[in-house]
């Protein structure tokens, strides 16, 4: 699967189920034949940084029909996680982070994203990671609104956007430790720096399969 960019497994030949049509193109069978459109967005069209913004623009020109948002997001029949109390979030760096919002969600279950979501992410070069992370990436690509998700249990108090202190360090999600300076905007709680604002999240508050409560961040850097 690694050679075909279908996953990280590299143990041997992929065995297809018995009902797979013999002689058919594998790309057609595995739904890997969707066209990929590569766009270069000019600075004045930030509304087209997501798929929906592009679709809205095309629909306005008579190319296709813009689907209602509710028909795009497939809501499950099972009970949804519940919203928790509003988390304590604030920005002390109005220049680097003019807007900083958060929403606590309780009772989530992390795991593998649905196949349809994983396929959509892979089609545009995004590697599926986990359900919670994949949802934030899907929303970002669809609506053009970057999000970040924290494991609530790994936070100490509220979250604040502020300037970094000289010499502060953060272990990022890519496994590297970065030393910060006063010109950088970070997201921190009372104990740790958790994000380099608008660039990369931190490992200390990353979600895992054991995560049950999260804080979803929506910020403007």
Predicted regions, residues:
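Conserved phosphate/anionic-ligand binding catalytic regions in large, soluble enzymes, centered on
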Residues: 43-63, 125-149, 191-209
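Solvent-exposed alpha-helices and their adjacent loops that cap or buttress functional pockets
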Residues: 28-32, 50, 59, 94-98, ...
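Phosphate-backbone binding interfaces of nucleic-acid-interacting proteins
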Residues: 1-81, 215
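Structured core elements
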Residues: 36-40, 50, 57, 102-104, ...
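Glycine/proline-enriched, intrinsically flexible loops and inter-domain linkers
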Residues: 62, 66-168
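Conserved catalytic alpha/beta cores of large enzymes that bind or transform nucleotide phosphates
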Residues: 1-21, 110-111, 133, 178-221
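A structural-propensity feature for long, helix-poor, extended segments
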Residues: 164-182
């Amino acid at each position: 699967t690694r050679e075909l960019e279908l996953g990280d497994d590299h143990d041997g030949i992929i065995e297809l189920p018995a009902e797979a049509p013999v002689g058919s193109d594998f790309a057609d069978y595995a739904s890997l034949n969707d066209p990929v459109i590569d766009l270069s967005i000019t600075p004045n069209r930030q509304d087209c940084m997501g798929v929906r913004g592009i679709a809205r623009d095309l629909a306005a020109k008579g190319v296709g029909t813009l689907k209602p948002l509710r028909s795009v997001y497939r809501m499950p029949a099972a009970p949804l996680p519940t919203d928790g109390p509003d988390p304590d979030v604030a920005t002390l760096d109005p220049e680097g982070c003019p807007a900083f919002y958060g929403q606590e969600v309780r009772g989530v279950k992390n795991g593998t994203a649905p196949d349809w979501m994983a396929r959509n992410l892979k089609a545009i070069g995004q590697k599926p990671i986990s359900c919670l992370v994949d949802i934030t990436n899907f929303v970002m690509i669809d609506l053009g609104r970057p999000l970040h998700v924290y494991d609530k249990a790994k936070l100490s108090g509220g979250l604040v956007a502020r300037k970094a202190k000289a010499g502060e360090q953060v272990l990022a999600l890519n496994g590297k430790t970065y030393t910060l300076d006063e010109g950088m905007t970070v997201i921190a709680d009372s104990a740790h720096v958790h994000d380099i604002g608008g660039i990369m999240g931190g490992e200390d508050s990353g979600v895992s399969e054991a995560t049950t409560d999260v804080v979803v961040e929506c910020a403007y850097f």
